[in-house]
Amino acid sequence: MTLQKAQAERIEKEIRELSRFSAEGPGVTRLTYTPEHAAARETLIAAMKAAALSVREDALGNIIGRREGTDPELPAIAVGSHFDSVRNGGMFDGTAGVVCALEAARVMLENGYVNRHPFEFIAIVEEEGARFSSGMLGGRAIAGLVADRELDSLVDEDGVSVRQAATAFGLKPGELQAAARSAADLRAFIELHIEQGPILEQEQIEIGVVTSIVGVRALRVAVKGRSDHAGTTPMHLRQDALVPAALMVREVNRFVNEIADGTVATVGHLTVAPGGGNQVPGEVDFTLDLRSPHEESLRVLIDRISVMVGEVASQAGVAADVDEFFNLSPVQLAPTMVDAVREAASALQFTHRDISSGAGHDSMFIAQVTDVGMVFVPSRAGRSHVPEEWTDFDDLRKGTEVVLRVMKALDR
């Protein structure tokens, strides 16, 4: 008997079909609890049922397709990703992982695979936070890390809360606690995802073996000088807030390059007030997004930034404050899962390398309740969160084969 393998053509067809469920505009915009979400939900549920999975939704709308095992006492082995998107994003981010999970389920069905553990194939909601500004909400719910009060405090731009939107969508957000999983009922979770960076493609590597997910620190720096007339205020009498702010940005860049361990820093937002072409800048606010797979690197970097900002401001005769408004620690994935992914890629003779994820994923929260492994596949030119996002479908097929092999290894 010839065993069936994952098919790139089926993966492509399903990803393209799901990409149609998008709000108007470039790329894919599929926000949570919208008509576009509803259409994708219907398609995914139908695909799960066609793969002989029993289907249920939890309180927030995570869709769980389940293939029962021969030993009902064993905890489930799960695979999945998210199916929401950023605004005007691409058709692969998250969705590729969901589709490849379903392709794995189809291959198991076609080959008559008999699994001991229950297998679950999960499509997760609201990872991006594009509607409610709270990333990885669905993954946090699976990990039992969403507080009931968040269902009311998290609102969209129209003031609609998660609780209101989920209820209108036909869900029961009041049953939030029942969505939480534990090691007792979840043996492991595997997530296939596009890399969203350039490393695999540049090095011509087929599979990324994710070892860690970066921690994130977000800082807001406020520099306050004095606004004056641009033509009548001598240079030596100015309290221009922009000049020291620019030096601060340059120094942060220097600090990070000195660390040279995968840590990165980005100034993604900067405002200058009053903002007139003939006015000396009186106030400058900018954000710093700091990411690293190493907690110690983040701690040292923040300490250096805080000292530097104070020194630069003092020398320039301006005031400055640093406020940390987001803190997420790095996650080291379970060594047993990292080894399983690495061994699967080797057995399939796919080129592979260890890699740290520079983006956050649901997996980093699910890792708090069970062992987690991640499989990366290449992103063309490293582009993601844009309409031009692209991953070759044959690379997704290879990733699916790795996932299948890992699931079977865990099932032994």
Swiss-Prot record:
Q: How does it assemble?
A: Homodimer.
Q: Where does an N-carbamoyl-L-alpha-amino acid bind?
A: Q196, H229, N278, R291, G360
Q: Sum up the protein's function in the record's words.
A: Catalyzes the hydrolysis of aliphatic N-carbamoyl-L-alpha-amino acids to free L-alpha-amino acids. Is strictly L-specific since it is inactive toward N-carbamoyl-D-alpha-amino acids. Shows a preference for aromatic N-carbamoyl-L-alpha-amino acids, such as N-carbamoyl-L-tryptophan and N-carbamoyl-L-tyrosine and, to a lesser extent, N-carbamoyl-L-phenylalanine and the non-natural amino acid N-carbamoyl-L-thienylalanine. Carbamoyl derivatives of beta-alanine and charged aliphatic amino acids are not accepted as substrates.
Superkingdom of source: Bacteria
Protein name in UniProt: N-carbamoyl-L-amino-acid amidohydrolase
Which organism is this entry from?
A: Paenarthrobacter aurescens (Arthrobacter aurescens)
Instruction: Fetch the InterPro entries from UniProt.
Output: Amidase_Cbmase, Bact_exopeptidase_dim_dom, Peptidase_M20
Q: Which reaction does it catalyse?
A: an N-carbamoyl-L-alpha-amino acid + H2O + 2 H(+) = an L-alpha-amino acid + NH4(+) + CO2; N-carbamoyl-L-tryptophan + H2O + 2 H(+) = L-tryptophan + NH4(+) + CO2; N-carbamoyl-L-tyrosine + H2O + 2 H(+) = L-tyrosine + NH4(+) + CO2; N-carbamoyl-L-phenylalanine + H2O + 2 H(+) = L-phenylalanine + NH4(+) + CO2
The gene name on file is hyuC
User: Could you say which residues bind a divalent metal cation 1 here?
Assistant: H82, D93, H193
Binding-site positions, a divalent metal cation 2:
D93, E128, H385
Question: Which family is this sequence assigned to?
Answer: Belongs to the peptidase M20 family.
- Site Necessary for dimerization: give positions: R238
Q: What does the record note about activity as a function of pH?
A: Optimum pH is 8.5.
Cofactor(s) annotated in UniProt: Mn(2+); Ni(2+); Co(2+); Fe(2+)
Keywords from the named record: Amino-acid biosynthesis, Cobalt, Hydrolase, Iron, Manganese, Metal-binding, Nickel
Q: What industrial or biotechnological use does the UniProt record describe for it?
A: Could be used as a biocatalyst for the industrial production of optically pure L-amino acids from racemic 5-substituted hydantoins.
According to its UniProt record, this protein's enzyme class is hydrolase
Task: Tell me its EC number(s), please.
Answer: 3.5.1.87
Comment on bound cofactor: Requires divalent metal cations for activity. Binds 2 divalent metal cations per subunit.
Q: Which GO molecular function annotations are given, in alphabetical order?
A: hydrolase activity, acting on carbon-nitrogen (but not peptide) bonds, in linear amidines; metal ion binding; N-carbamoyl-L-amino-acid hydrolase activity
Known SUPFAM superfamilies for this protein? Bacterial exopeptidase dimerisation domain, Zn-dependent exopeptidases
The free-text temperature note is: Optimum temperature is 50 degrees Celsius.
**A single BP term in Gene Ontology:** amino acid biosynthetic process
Renumbered to this chain, region (Involved in dimerization) spans: 212-330
